[in-house]
């Protein structure tokens, strides 16, 4: 038979574990998913928010600050369907406090995408087939990103991040890079050949 003191210790330990789980729950990272369009002209987004009554659509600026952006096809979805919202200044929307999934569509300027959050998020970016990331001169994945290449798309994921960025390219840009590199190499060979020819002539 266990002593009452030991039983009380087990109960206290169990209570502490439950309390820790409850306190840690709000701190768990939420999910945000972005899908780049086939023509890379824009993207669709789905972002979870918890205990929220507003959301601002932003992207990182040159100094890492949050810069408001214009988006369209906004939907705020709750447990029982779509929820009405009001548009405010600086690309912000407001709605009744609660947990929601916010979806929208944004535009891309060039072959790059970046996003910024005020709290940690699990971020997933889906890049369609025909675009690549692996060449360090043309492609880029921000710190913490994990790249998984599938049959018709590339999936990039981050866990618990406030910032995510990718820069991608297509085969045409890769061909241009190789062509430029070849021209530059030929140009350097011609210069070096001329230089050594002049030195040889001066010695004679």
Regions found by a protein language model. Give the residues of each.
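Lumenal/extracellular ectodomains and adaptor appendage modules
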Residues: 25-204
């Amino acid at each position: 038979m266990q002593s009452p003191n030991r039983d009380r210790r087990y109960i206290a330990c169990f209570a502490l574990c439950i309390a820790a789980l409850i306190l840690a729950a709000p701190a768990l990272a939420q999910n945000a998913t972005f899908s780049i369009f086939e023509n890379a002209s824009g993207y669709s987004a789905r972002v979870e928010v918890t205990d929220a009554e507003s959301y601002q659509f932003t992207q990182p600026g040159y100094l890492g600050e949050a810069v408001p952006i214009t988006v369209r096809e906004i939907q705020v979805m709750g447990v029982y369907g779509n929820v009405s919202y009001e548009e405010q200044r600086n690309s912000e929307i407001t709605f009744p406090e609660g947990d929601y999934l916010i979806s929208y569509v944004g535009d891309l300027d060039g072959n790059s995408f970046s996003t910024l959050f005020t709290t940690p998020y699990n971020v997933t970016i889906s890049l369609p087939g025909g675009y690549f990331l692996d060449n360090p001169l043309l492609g880029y994945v921000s710190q913490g990103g994990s790249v998984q290449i599938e049959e018709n798309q590339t999936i990039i994921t981050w866990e618990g991040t406030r910032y995510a960025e990718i820069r991608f390219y297509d085969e045409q840009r890769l061909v241009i890079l190789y062509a430029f590199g070849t021209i530059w190499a030929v140009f350097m060979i011609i210069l070096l050949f001329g230089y050594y020819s002049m030195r040889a002539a001066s010695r004679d």
